[in-house]
Amino acid sequence: MLPPLNKKFSFIIKTAFFTTALLAVLLYLFTPKPDITQPNAYSTAFYDSSGKLLRLNLAADDRYRLWTPIDKIPLSVQQATLLYEDQDFYEHTGVDFIALINAFYTSYIKRSHRVGASTITMQVARLHFGMNTHVIFGKVEQILRALQIERHYSKNQILEAYFNLAPYGSNIEGVGAASLIYFKKPAIDLNLPESLLLSLIPQNPTKRNPIKKSAKLVLLETRKKLFTRWLEKYPEDKHWLAAMQLPIKVYASSDLPFEAPHFINNLQSEYPHLKPGEYKTSIDLNLQNLLQRHAKNYINRRQRDGLSNTSAILLNYKTMEVVAELGSVDFFNNDISGQVNGVRAKRSPGSTLKPFIYALAIDEGLIHPLTLVKDAPKRFGGYTPENYDQQFLGPISATESLVLSRNVPAVNLMYRLQKVGLYDLLVAADVKKLQPKEFYGLALALGGSEVTMLELVKLYAMLANLGVYKDEVILKKDAAVINQNNPNSPNNPNKHIKQLISPEAAYLTLQMLSKNSAVDEISFQKERRQSYPVYWKTGTSFAFRDAWSVGIVGPYVLATWVGNFSGEGHPSFIGRQAAAPLFFEIIRSLDSYGLIKGNIKPGGLNITEVDICSTTGDLPNVHCPKTEKGLFIPGKSPIKVSDVHREIYIDKASGLRACQYDEFTTTKAVYEFWPSDLVRLFKQAGIVKRQPPPYLDSCLINNTSTQGSAPTITSPSNLISYTIRASKLKQESLPFSATTDTDSRILYWFVDNSFVGKVERDTPFFWHPQVGEFDVRVVDNLGRSASVSMRVKLVQ
């Protein structure tokens, strides 16, 4: 029973009551619905693919505030808060008028001590509208707003708003952020002791800040009292009694994780349309830590060799998810510009683009994996590529040429491509910031352009996906992504799906890459838990600025880079020596965890396995001494029966070559008949090939002209047109050259059937040109011939 009041005070109370009631009715009936779900700003939380927190950002107002729906807030938190703050929450209409009058009398009339009577709804009104409820008019407004809120929102919606607005100490607001910071877990995973602790903080967040030692002791004591009340209402929870006596670990905001920093920074900068909220990324924190650990240990071991920084990325080519991204070895090391993201920075790729030249050449029918290509000095206009070791190996298979990273064969194949070139492929694969095609020329084959590590691994993923290019995925499909219909959304993996290389060409290229041995092949084979291929390639950029290793293993594309963000070169920055060891360390670690599973074994490809003559790369004839299994694409790959190994007749008496077989005077022998240009390359490479002996003098020209291969004119090209200045006509000379069979010795040159000169095999003949159209013919000493047409015209 309230004590009797004097008439004046009674009048004030009645007037205030009726005025408030009138305003409440007007507010209830005519004011629009307030939006209590939207404070000034929310934080953004990024998680790994399994839900581990990677980073929690401050909101725009420098507070941690994370929107958490009511169904993600455990009942223990809801019930503990209502038990402590508002036991009649589900009965009142937003204001507990009896409690309010009692509080008013105690606080303002009796003045014994301050008593609060705010309901959960009233607290939502105060927190949302930011009103000062320590004065009468502020309290009146709070009451009116609470009634307004109750009209427009359900109890669950009001409770949800409270748990997202309530202060939990320092700059932490909302139970979602409080749970992540204080207990390193989402709110839904809070247990009863943690729930009780959190429910006490909003009433006095400054004095009950759990990270303050003095406040924590008071908080724990208050929690014991609340738990006693809890057991009166929920006696079935008495099994928590022992846990309530144990110390509770509480973390501070300074303990928040800062994982995959380059990845998260890029995600935020590249996709600014992402609204604040919670996002599950493609990152696997276990794999991220694996890359970080190996990179750090590797650089520490190799610092004496001049290695100070590295970047790496691991992409699951089946899902196209970036599961680990390491932009630098140390994000916080300013000496190496650690905050630069090496995965997204443009760098010269060195030789890592060569596999795509070979894939395009296979697709165009220029080669198959065992086709012989020429590793020899060759001039392409004003461009003369050289090999890293300054040596030339002569004729080698396309597979050897690729895994040994020979430059001339790669440039020559790129030069011969007619349909789709390497530049066209890079454009189709959405490689950014390319210069015009003419800017690079043939140097593009050797790393003349710049790509990012991410662009590079997507190209290799395209090979693993049998020529199908897809974009990367950096957010999980179930992430709370804004603008899901936006084609540029970061979890829209289907925005760029296209077949860039045929499945057959991609598969054959992978088989070629699998022949590349590991850096330490013997130990690598011993340490493997199981047998699996590694389809990989190294690269070294000009002036030793970048060392690369990139490849496919199991379901992953892995790339490692070693270098300096300053662009300064170092002799140690060689792909196989600097980047490959780290590449295989990571592979071994993945294997040790059983993560390398599966193999690229597609079905339904138009590929045939046949016997190939090991020496020539063609189908074997009956005289080929050794064969091996090889793959080719029927109707596309350049496959023919080899004619290099030929059986000839040797005169027993002289050892010279006979025209016809006689069982008494001749014997049979098999020799290799190589074109003269390849014979020359074998010699340059130090490879000795046994030459067939010359014919007997008694052999007539008509006996030899139909045997073996005719010469092939390499200069001039057929139907070529030469333009010569009139003033230089007398001084000009045009080179005539041809490749011949091994047994050719002399070449005779004719222009319009007029003999113009002779030279030894492999020696060019120089002709002084005339104006007009001409037929040029060459005949070797055995009577075999070839011809081309050419034209010479003058300009003044």
Predicted ranges, named:
Residues 1-49, 108:
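N-terminal type II signal-anchor transmembrane helix
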Residues 4-9, 13, 47, 244-256, ...:
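Soluble, non-transmembrane domains of envelope/secretory-pathway proteins that act on or interact
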Residues 23-25, 112, 116-289, 293, ...:
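Non-catalytic, structured segments within soluble enzyme domains
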Residues 79-82, 230, 291, 320, ...:
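Active-site SXXK
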Residues 90-100, 173-176, 236-238, 336, ...:
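Short, well-structured active-site flanking segments
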Residues 106-134, 258-269, 367-422, 469, ...:
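Conserved catalytic neighborhood of penicillin-recognizing serine enzymes
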Residues 183, 216-217, 431-490, 494-500, ...:
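Active-site-proximal helix/loop microenvironment
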Residues 262, 310-347, 351, 359-360, ...:
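Active-site beta-strand/loop architecture of penicillin-binding DD-peptidases
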